[in-house]
């Protein structure tokens, strides 16, 4: 291949020196992409491709204007590309270009997304004796936040859950995780984050510790308690190293180090956040999510903070009570609340403006936005102090956290310097007010006097020459010129020097005009240079106050989030919950916070404590079982956000995690069936939940055969009750499980009530779903009735009801057996009342198997508990003879299996093994 020279050669040389996916190189007023990069960018952004010749070869070229680079780079980063930027600057020998930054998903300052934009690193240190130790660090370079934690004696699931709470845009796996395919696969499944392999040396303990202490100071590192947490420090050092490597000046914005422990936040894994639809619905839309429902914020920072609160609920009761008190005060001070919200609606995003200032990318409009927002702090403070209810609340203390005097001083400095509406570019002048600097004022006066001379020149020349069609203008080619209409060119003075002829006019210059042009250009350049120098100093002053901007921005964001929660509480009649230690969960007239916005909602009570830990929820299809359980989880979550809740009253015992197995999300695209996903989610819950957790289980086991499903559901229930002891709500159509309410002391049954008679063969029935939850079990699901409501053809509905009635009358289900010589199939029939097999019976063509049931006697005979083989009846020998060897082997294993002593996941695997054996016969 011919070696390129010139601009293309320079581009290719720079590209070889970076590991970025794409390179944008400034060439004058454009950023250009060459060669393969040009083809990629053109395809992704629909740009026109031209050709650039170099050393006998032709290279594709695509470009974007300098002023339009940001949106194009943002689009590329959103598509997963890492884009290097090579800026052009002047030297004594002409132009020079160098890579100044690499824009990646986790280091993108100019993002248009108002939500947090986290870059995270995860490190693992293996342990032979117990669980591993994980270090996790995450920073949002757009706001300067930096958070770090260490998980001791943890597993991969806990680390992944912790990572997911940040919703990172980019993740740096530590060296020991890069070859762990299982971990990386799970990481890809749970997040959309880009995975980047950063320099392994940056993860080394010594180097990482030096990097962290250099950035934040040894005193800060030790005071937040991570000085001796080597694994956490390794992750933190890698994040800081990556930020420094990818962006000049970006690291200066990272000033707020926060360390948190494992007990600071509620565990919300990816499955739970999805199932509870915290920030987006199951369909992937933000509209209709919990955040969308309760978000009444008027600032970007306030909305971002409220979303973070939802995704990372707290376990600190004092902090939750502080938040509740702020919401309560604003709820009771309507006029002051609206005054504050109206003031905040004029606020800009100070946290992100601070990051832009420290990185050197802030323009004059950004600094004016800083000034205007800092000035609002005093107005908000006045609204609080002038309202007795607010002045006596923690809101007053929150405002004390921001240095109002320093904020007022910086705001005054910026206001005295900048014009009210500065231009968008900082190189074209017009940024500063008169009086900011005497030398600058003198240059501005001279420049504007020269411009005024030019502005009045046409009138003077018309009067002097008598020419009516005369104007003065300027362009890049001709500079300043006098233009005269063709009909009057004979009247031009002799000193007019002709420079160009057009169709209807001619252009001239004069010695005076040439001299004045030189003066204007000289003064213009001097003015622009001086203004830019002053602007750089002013921007540096703002950057020095980055921590102040972040503090004020955080304060205003908190006020906005509190006001948003107060607005929603007042408009929807929400109540302040009592947040307590212990396992009590008491909800009076609770409602679902999202569903109640669109549907007339029937409130329901819920009570759980140490003696009532596990609720089995039964009831018809479409009756509201899932909604009832979700609202319990959401009320708990909202209480641990610090919000009021949709209920008449509520007492919420603090939980350490909320875990859900809800719905039937099929992930066939990843090669996993609905049932496999369900079992993996159940496995995660059984491994992760503790006695302080809240667990929501919806229809566990329904994705497989009936016996398998009941066995798994039964065993999981026993395991949770006996081993984990977490508060659990379990909705099921396996009515056999309700027997556990009599056998296990902390298990209770509740059901969603129905009014009327169910449909039966020959009768339409009349059923009303009351949506009311009552104590005790139910034994009907009304599935055929729901099928009728859904519009299933009447013959199918009628036949379904007839089959259902027969099964109920017979109280038996039939199990597949061995083939007979006549082509029929012998069925092993299991009697639901006796808990024993009946005589085998041949049926031509093979009768359909029944639809439900665990082999358990309905009279509660303890000899026939789930997982144990029914006692052999008088016809036991005949039954054995009628079954094939595979079925008999499975029954034999089932007889010997102790369900109570078998872990649920192992039991699940055994059931799947039996199912495979029977399917293969």
From Swiss-Prot:
The keyword Aminoacyl-tRNA synthetase does not apply. One of its GO terms (molecular function) is mismatched DNA binding. Keywords: ATP-binding, DNA damage, DNA repair, DNA-binding, Nucleotide-binding. Residues 837-887 are annotated as: Disordered. CDD domains: ABC_MutS1. It comes from the Archaea. Residues 840-853 have a biased composition (Low complexity). The keyword Transcription regulation does not apply. HAMAP family: MutS. This protein is involved in the repair of mismatches in DNA. It is possible that it carries out the mismatch recognition step. This protein has a weak ATPase activity. Belongs to the DNA mismatch repair MutS family. This is DNA mismatch repair protein MutS 1. The gene is mutS1.
């Amino acid at each position: 291949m011919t070696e390129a020279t010139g601009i293309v050669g320079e581009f290719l040389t720079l590209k070889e020196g970076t590991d970025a996916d794409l390179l944008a190189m400034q060439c004058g007023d454009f950023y250009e992409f060459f060669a393969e990069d040009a083809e990629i960018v053109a395809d992704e952004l629909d740009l026109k491709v031209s050709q650039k010749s170099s050393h006998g070869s032709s290279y594709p070229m695509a470009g974007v204007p300098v002023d339009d680079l940001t949106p194009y780079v943002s689009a590329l980063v959103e598509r997963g590309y890492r884009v290097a930027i090579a800026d052009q600057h002047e030297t004594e020998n002409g132009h020079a270009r160098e890579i100044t930054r690499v824009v990646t998903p986790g280091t993108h300052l100019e993002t248009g997304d108002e939500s947090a934009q986290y870059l995270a690193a995860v490190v693992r240190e293996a342990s032979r004796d117990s669980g591993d130790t994980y270090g996790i660090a995450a920073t949002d370079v757009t706001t300067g936040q930096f958070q770090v934690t260490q998980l001791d004696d943890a597993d991969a699931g806990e680390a992944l859950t912790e990572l997911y709470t940040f919703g990172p845009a980019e993740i740096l796996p530590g060296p020991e995780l890069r070859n762990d395919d299982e971990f990386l696969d799970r990481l890809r499944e749970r997040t959309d984050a880009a995975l980047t392999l950063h320099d392994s040396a940056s993860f080394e303990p010594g180097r990482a510790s030096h990097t962290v202490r250099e950035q934040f100071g040894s005193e800060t590192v030790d005071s937040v308690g991570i000085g001796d947490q080597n694994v956490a420090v390794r992750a933190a050092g890698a994040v800081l190293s990556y930020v420094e490597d990818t962006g000049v000046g970006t690291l200066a914005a990272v000033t707020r180090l926060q360390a948190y422990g494992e007990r600071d936040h509620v565990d919300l894994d990816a499955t739970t956040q999805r199932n509870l639809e915290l920030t987006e619905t199951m369909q992937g839309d933000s509209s209709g999510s919990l955040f969308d429902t309760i978000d009444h914020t008027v600032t970007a920072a306030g909305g971002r903070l409220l979303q973070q609160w939802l995704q990372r609920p707290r376990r600190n009761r004092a902090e939750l009570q502080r938040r509740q008190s702020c919401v309560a005060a604003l709820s009771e001070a309507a006029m002051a609340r609206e005054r504050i919200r109206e003031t905040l609606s004029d606020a800009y995003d100070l946290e992100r403006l601070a990051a832009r200032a420290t990185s050197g990318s802030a323009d004059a409009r950004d600094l004016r936005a800083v000034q205007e927002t800092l000035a609002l702090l005093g107005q908000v403070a006045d609204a609080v102090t002038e309202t007795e209810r607010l002045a006596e609340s923690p809101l007053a203390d929150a405002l004390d956290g921001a240095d109002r005097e320093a904020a007022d001083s910086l705001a005054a400095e910026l206001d005295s310097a900048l014009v009210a509406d500065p231009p968008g570019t900082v190189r074209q002048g017009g940024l500063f007010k008169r009086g900011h600097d005497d030398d600058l004022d003198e240059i501005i006066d001279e420049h504007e006097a020269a411009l005024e001379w030019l502005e009045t020149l046409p009138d003077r020349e018309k009067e002097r020459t008598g020419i009516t069609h005369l104007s003065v203008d300027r362009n890049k080619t001709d500079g300043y010129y006098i233009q005269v209409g063709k009909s009057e060119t004979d009247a031009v003075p002799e000193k007019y020097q002709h420079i160009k002829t057009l169709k209807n006019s001619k252009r001239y210059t004069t010695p005076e005009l040439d001299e004045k042009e030189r003066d204007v250009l000289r003064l213009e350049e001097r003015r622009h240079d001086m203004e830019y120098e002053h602007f750089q100093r002013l921007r540096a002053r703002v950057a020095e106050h980055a921590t102040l901007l972040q503090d004020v921005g955080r304060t205003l964001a908190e006020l906005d989030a509190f006001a948003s929660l107060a607005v929603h509480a007042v408009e929807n009649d929400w109540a302040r919950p009592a947040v307590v230690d212990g396992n009590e969960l008491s909800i009076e007239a609770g409602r679902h916070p999202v569903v109640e916005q669109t549907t007339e909602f029937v409130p329901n009570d819920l009570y759980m404590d140490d003696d009532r830990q596990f609720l089995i929820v039964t009831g018809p299809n479409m009756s509201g079982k899932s909604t009832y359980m979700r609202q319990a989880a959401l009320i708990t979550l909202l209480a641990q956000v610090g919000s009021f809740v949709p209920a008449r009253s509520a007492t919420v015992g603090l939980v350490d995690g909320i875990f859900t197995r809800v719905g039937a999300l099929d992930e066939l695209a990843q090669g996993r069936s609905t049932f496999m996903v369900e079992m993996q989610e159940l496995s995660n819950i059984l491994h992760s939940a503790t006695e302080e957790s809240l667990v929501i289980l919806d229809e566990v086991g329904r994705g497989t055969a009936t016996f398998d499903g009941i066995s798994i559901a039964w065993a999981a229930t026993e395991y949770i009750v006996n081993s984990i002891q977490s508060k659990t709500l379990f909705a099921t159509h396996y009515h056999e499980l309700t027997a556990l309410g009599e056998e296990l002391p902390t298990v209770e049954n509740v059901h969603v009530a129905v009014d009327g008679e169910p449909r039966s063969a020959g009768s339409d029935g009349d059923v009303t779903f009351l949506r009311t939850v009552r104590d005790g079990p139910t034994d009907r699901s009304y599935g055929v009735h729901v099928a009728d409501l859904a519009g299933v053809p009447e013959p199918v509905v009628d036949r379904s009801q007839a089959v259902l009635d027969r099964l109920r009358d017979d109280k038996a289900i039939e199990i597949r057996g061995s083939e007979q010589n006549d082509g029929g199939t012998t069925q092993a029939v299991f009697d639901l009342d006796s808990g024993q097999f009946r005589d085998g019976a041949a049926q031509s063509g093979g009768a359909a198997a029944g639809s439900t049931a665990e082999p358990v006697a309905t009279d509660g005979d303890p000899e026939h508990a789930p997982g144990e083989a029914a006692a052999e009846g008088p016809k036991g020998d005949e039954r054995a003879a009628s079954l094939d060897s595979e079925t008999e082997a499975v029954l034999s294993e089932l007889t010997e299996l102790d369900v109570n002593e078998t872990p649920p996941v192992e039991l699940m695997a055994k059931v799947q093994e039996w199912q495979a054996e029977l399917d293969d016969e």
